[in-house]
Amino acid sequence: MKTLLSSPSFDDLIRLLRAWRFWLLVALLGGLLGAAVYFIAPPDFRVRATVVVTFNMEKAWPVNSDKELFYYLERESRKVWEVAWADATLQQVADETGFSVLELRSGKLELTQPQDGGWHFYATDPQAAVAAKLASAWAGAFSAQIHQGIETAVALDAARKALAVNPQDAKLQASISELEAKSLGITPELQISLAQAKDLPAERKSSLGMYVLAGAALLLAIGALLILFFLHKENVP
């Protein structure tokens, strides 16, 4: 095979298979190279805090249709997700940690959630203690915002019921308007608890094994190109 655009021949494949000693050496060197990169320029630390979110769908949406329950859960999950990234939530984290909101939104924080269950708040930083502080502050700020939103939702629901009994009450109307302005749009049946926010373990964002495998794969690919396109048969081990 003489050019990069030509198809490999059977002889080319045989040449690759015959170079097994070469592959072992290259894989070893690549793994060592990946490990060296890991220790010289290690990845950031990653810390996870957890908040348990329960939507109580049976109470909030008492229907028998699984499809409607699914859509309800999806809609409410999106609302709660937005609270996690809201300006007020991130500003509280920024005030506690010293980072700007822009920095927090630019890769410092990550959120994963299975809808009903544990929501995982991840933070990354070169320093393990800083990453732990970020994750804990974010989970705490989120919990505080949601608790406030639940209180507002409960008060708004009660005010609307009272207004239905006395629709001419101007004070109730003003109170409802004020509550609606503060409302997060979440259901009052929502329940949350801060499950993991203290003494959080820190791990590297990428493991040593991933670096070793990446280094070995990279040198193996380079070695294959060298054998196929640049080395003659007599030079192959």
Language-model region placement:
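Short, disordered/basic amphipathic segments at the extreme N-terminus
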Residues: 1-27, 184, 193-195, 224-237
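Juxtamembrane loop-helix boundary motifs flanking transmembrane segments in multi-pass membrane proteins
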Residues: 2-13, 65-72, 201
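Short, Lys/Arg-rich cytosolic juxtamembrane segment immediately N-terminal
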Residues: 15-20, 201-208
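Hydrophobic membrane-insertion alpha-helices, especially the h-region
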Residues: 22-38
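Alpha-helical transmembrane segments of multipass membrane proteins
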Residues: 33-34, 218, 222-223
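Flexible, low-complexity linker/tail segments at the boundary of structured domains
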Residues: 40-57, 232-237
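Soluble oligomerization/assembly scaffold segments of membrane-associated complexes
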Residues: 45, 52, 64-65, 74-81, ...
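N-terminal membrane-entry
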Residues: 204-218
